[in-house]
């Protein structure tokens, strides 16, 4: 072994394996870019993003931890969401939940 070496198993790692997903169309109706991080409660993102918020309640982006999706002004794109896991308690963000889902 070489100091600092990382030995991994063969094959790809599938993110959020076995988790239910929701795909929805999101549009930036604002005049500024909006970036949403991997673990942000999607229901509570910037109000200038137009989508079915109720479908996004308790969900986050299905992307790698520490990454983000950027929405340019006027841009529409499909995103895939997965449930927020753990205790399923939401605090902060835009303070729309502040407790258990």
Swiss-Prot record:
The enzyme's E.C. designation: 3.5.1.5
CDD domains: Urease_beta
GO molecular function: urease activity
Keywords: Cytoplasm, Hydrolase, Virulence
Catalytic activity entry: urea + 2 H2O + H(+) = hydrogencarbonate + 2 NH4(+)
GO cellular component annotations of the record: urease complex
Top-level taxonomic group: Bacteria
Cytoplasm as UniProt keyword: yes
A UniProt-annotated Pfam family: Urease_beta
Main function: Disruption of the ure1 gene cluster suggests that it protects brucellae during their passage through the stomach. The major route of infection in human brucellosis is oral.
Predominant localisation class: cytoplasm
Assembly: Heterotrimer of UreA (gamma), UreB (beta) and UreC (alpha) subunits. Three heterotrimers associate to form the active enzyme.
Subcellular location: Cytoplasm
Organism: Brucella abortus (strain 2308)
GO biological process, one term: urea catabolic process
Pathway: Nitrogen metabolism; urea degradation; CO(2) and NH(3) from urea (urease route): step 1/1
Lineage, uppermost ranks: Bacteria, Pseudomonadati, Pseudomonadota, Alphaproteobacteria, Hyphomicrobiales
Similarity comment: Belongs to the urease beta subunit family.
Protein name: Urease subunit beta 1
């Amino acid at each position: 072994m070489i100091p600092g070496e990382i030995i991994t198993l063969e094959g790809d790692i599938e993110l959020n394996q076995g988790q239910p997903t929701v795909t929805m169309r999101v549009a930036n109706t604002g005049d500024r870019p909006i970036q949403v991080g991997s673990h942000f409660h999607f229901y509570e993102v910037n109000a200038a993003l137009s989508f079915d918020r109720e479908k996004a309640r308790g969900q986050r982006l299905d992307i790698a931890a520490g990454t983000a999706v950027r929405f340019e002004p006027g841009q529409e794109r499909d995103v895939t969401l997965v449930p927020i896991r753990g205790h399923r308690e939401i605090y902060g963000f835009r303070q729309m939940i502040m407790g258990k889902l």
